[in-house]
């Protein structure tokens, strides 16, 4: 497979359209408490290098992933001969300082400066306010606070698209309704197991706002064998959910299709989704991702899964 499909984003970035697969790098920051495993620097750097070599040139990170380790490791690769000539699209996120719970205007500017320094860049193509559900909405949007600060960064040419990235659908909608968002990232709510982001996606499209879907594997359970005790939304799955995933593995097996391929393409084949963020922890996972993205999936399999799961979701 060559480079991922490049979809015409609702907003263009310097003539660079948005690839429909984005490399998620929170695992590459070394976050064992979140994922149940660690990734050391050598493995992280090798993974990022391999992703670029395979044509994955849209990278998502955050100031707080691994206390900045994700960004620093990405920066190590980007500094290597200009990432070997790759045109890399970088998305990062504004976060509070370590151990703090404040994301005011000053902190947004500080967070941007920290991220840019670690990454070794002067400009970020996409910049989000991260997990805004952690903060009071009125404080975030009042004059001089976070929203104004991120808009100023855009006006200064330091960032391209601006938006919010988080898991709370209600909070995402509040920011969408400001009319000031270019892009919204939501995770774990548009998967085979949960379609609850559908109304938000529809409204983003209507408003001309790019929607980015993160965690199509629901934090692992749709990509790993159940014997490995994968997590669902970063928690242990319920017995009912495990039974559903067991059925998915069986039905996919009858068609010779990995469940991970079906789960990935559920997002990547939806034209409303501008890009799908997939967290990857090792070079061989990049190869698996590319195979799953390219795999042919019989329509009959999709129909069977929809008949079983669609009525349960929403």
Question: Can you say where each PLM-predicted feature lies in the sequence?
Answer:
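N-terminal binding-site loop/beta-alpha segment at the start of enzyme catalytic domains
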Residues: 1-88
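Beta/alpha (TIM)-barrel catalytic core signal, keyed to glycine-rich beta->alpha loops juxtaposed to Asp/Glu
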Residues: 2, 132-313
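Short, well-ordered coil/turn segments that N-cap beta-strands
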Residues: 16-21, 55-57, 84-88, 121-125, ...
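Conserved, mostly hydrophobic/aromatic
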Residues: 23, 44, 59, 74, ...
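Short, acidic/polar
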Residues: 37-51, 103-118, 168-174
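Acidic-and-aromatic substrate-binding clefts and catalytic sites of carbohydrate-active enzymes
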Residues: 62-71, 97-102, 135-138, 190-195
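A short, structured active-site edge motif that brings together acidic residues
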Residues: 86-99
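Active-site groove signature of glycoside hydrolases
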Residues: 116-136
């Amino acid at each position: 497979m060559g480079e991922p499909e490049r979809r015409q984003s609702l907003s263009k970035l310097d003539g660079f359209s948005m690839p429909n697969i984005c490399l998620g790098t929170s695992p590459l920051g070394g976050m064992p408490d979140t994922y149940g495993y660690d990734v050391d620097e050598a493995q992280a750097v090798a993974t990022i290098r391999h992703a670029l070599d395979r044509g994955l040139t849209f990278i998502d990170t955050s100031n707080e992933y691994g206390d900045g380790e994700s960004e620093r490791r990405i920066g190590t690769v980007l500094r290597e001969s200009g990432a070997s000539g790759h045109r890399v699209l970088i998305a990062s996120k504004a976060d509070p300082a370590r151990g703090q719970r404040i994301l005011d205007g000053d902190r947004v500017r500080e967070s941007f400066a920290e991220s840019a320094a670690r990454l070794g860049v002067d400009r970020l193509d996409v910049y989000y306010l991260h997990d805004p559900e952690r903060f009071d909405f009125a404080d975030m949007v009042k004059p001089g606070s976070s929203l104004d600060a991120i808009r100023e960064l855009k006006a200064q040419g330091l960032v391209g698209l601006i938006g919010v990235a988080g898991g709370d659908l209600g909070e995402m909608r509040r920011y969408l309704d400001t009319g000031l968002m270019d892009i919204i990232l939501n995770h774990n709510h548009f998967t085979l197991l949960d379609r609850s982001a559908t109304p938000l996606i529809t409204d983003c499209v209507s408003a001309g706002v790019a929607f980015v879907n993160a965690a199509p594997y629901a934090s692992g359970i749709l990509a790993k064998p159940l014997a490995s005790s994968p997590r669902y939304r970063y928690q242990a799955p319920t017995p009912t959910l495990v039974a559903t995933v067991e059925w998915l593995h069986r039905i996919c097996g009858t068609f010779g299709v990995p469940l991970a391929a079906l789960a990935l393409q559920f997002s990547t084949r939806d034209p409303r989704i501008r890009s799908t963020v997939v967290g990857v922890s090792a070079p061989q996972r990049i190869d698996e991702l590319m195979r799953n993205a390219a795999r042919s999936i019989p329509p009959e399999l999709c129909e069977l899964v929809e008949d079983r799961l669609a009525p349960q979701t929403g």
